[in-house]
Amino acid sequence: MTHSRNYKTLRRFIVPALAGGALAALAFAPTFGAEPVHSNVPPQNIFAPKADAPNANMPKNDVPRPDDVKTGEINEPTPHKEADPSTFTGTSVISENKTLEHQRFDNTTSDQNAFIGKNKATITIDSSVFDKQGNTTNDDNSNFRGQNAVVLGIEGSQTSIKNSNITSNSIGSNAVFATGEGSVINIENTNIHTKGDSSRGLDATYKGTVNGKNLTITTEGAHSATLATDRGEGTINAEAAKLTTSGAGSPVIYSTGNITANSINGVANKSEIGVVEGKNSITLTNSNVTGYHDNGFMLYQSFSGDAESGIARLKAENNTLTTHGTGAFIYVNNTTAEADLTGNTVLMPNTTTLVKAAADSRWGKDGENGGHLTLRASTQELNGNIVADSISTVSLDMTNGSSLVGAVNTDNTAKEITLKLSKDSTWTLTGDSYVKSLTNEDTTGSNIHLNGYKLVVADK
């Protein structure tokens, strides 16, 4: 599919950078945590960039992604065979157990890394500076294998970094990248800042794992999510982090694997809060996250080869979730998805669409690319309309005192929409609504407030 490859851009998200300053600057002990969310990227006064931002011209094989997709233009990347990460080179390549403090790891050569941990080595690094400049020349290697990243973990290595500063100022320079089963990077009390396109904050592929705690991550480029997984799946666990993106197609979270985030403050200034592609997941708890573009969350399948087909999953509990976009709070297309919402505050000032399940011409085969969502709400207030097209379905299950204020399938276009209400859950209509079936534990129907509108149940 020509369309499929392009929006994958969304996933090329995470990290541009500032440079280090003198070693004395390492004396900082970064403190992060529950800072208020800001709509703009906060100034980074501690570190100054070592050089001007790279030339805006992208390498031949680095394809502009989200904007081209949105305008319908087709711009296929040149295919490349992914390289074996064991052949990658860098400033410091460590293959044996080692403990380091107060080090600098700088690299300015294209397709090299500042640091590589390999060969099942256990490596501990404290109070150090990592900086990367020099654009990637191979989009697939940098996105999927971690070439040209600042910090790379491969071959089952276990790398721990704390009290440090990680920056990049080049295209395709992810900040912290783990690839391959058993490869783990643990990072704590660290500042991360990337400036180039396709430069994510924490990234994992092919069953690699990155665990982050007490982090500040800022990305400025397009396709640069702060938390991301890509081809072959990967795992990201983030806790107590401040996350900010300012590039197009750079959500706070992009999952082609499994990403869990707890107690984060996140802002995507030109993108959605989060995106799940294929049989993968986002779990978000006790957090405050905001997106300014498109939808709140998108769950989809591109068939680009980066994500297995299956159920896309979103689980959100005890968060404040804000979308300033004009799309839907949850948009599902070309996949089957499940969303579990529990006790969240949902804010959507610029749209009245809570859920949209519909085909999208960018992905899938016409007539077969609808969205299919099961939405479970527990102790959850929901405000907004539920819409679906003729090849899409929505199933809403409300329990434990949940409420919906909105119209369901008001244009009667959906293939199928079903509702279940517990006795203590309520639905207040704001427009005529059409559903295939309605299961209500309150046999009197007193928990449904028609508000003067028509409710039509097909299977009655």
Protein language model features and the residues they cover:
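Bacterial Sec-dependent N-terminal signal peptides
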Residues: M1-A17
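Bacterial N-terminal signal peptides
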Residues: P16-A25
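Sec-dependent signal peptide cleavage junction
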Residues: A27-Q44, P49
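N-terminal segments that cap or nucleate solenoid repeat domains
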Residues: R65-T137, L455
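Extracellular beta-strand/beta-solenoid scaffold signature
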Residues: K81-T89, T109-I116, N138-L152, S170-A178, ...
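All-beta strand scaffolds that present successive hydrophobic residues in beta-strands
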Residues: I94-H102, T122-S127, Q158-N163, V184-T190, ...
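Post-signal-peptide, soluble extracytosolic/periplasmic N-terminal scaffold domains
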Residues: L100, G117-K195, D203-G212
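Surface-exposed loop/turn positions within long extracellular repeat scaffolds
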Residues: N409-E416, L429-N440, A458-D459
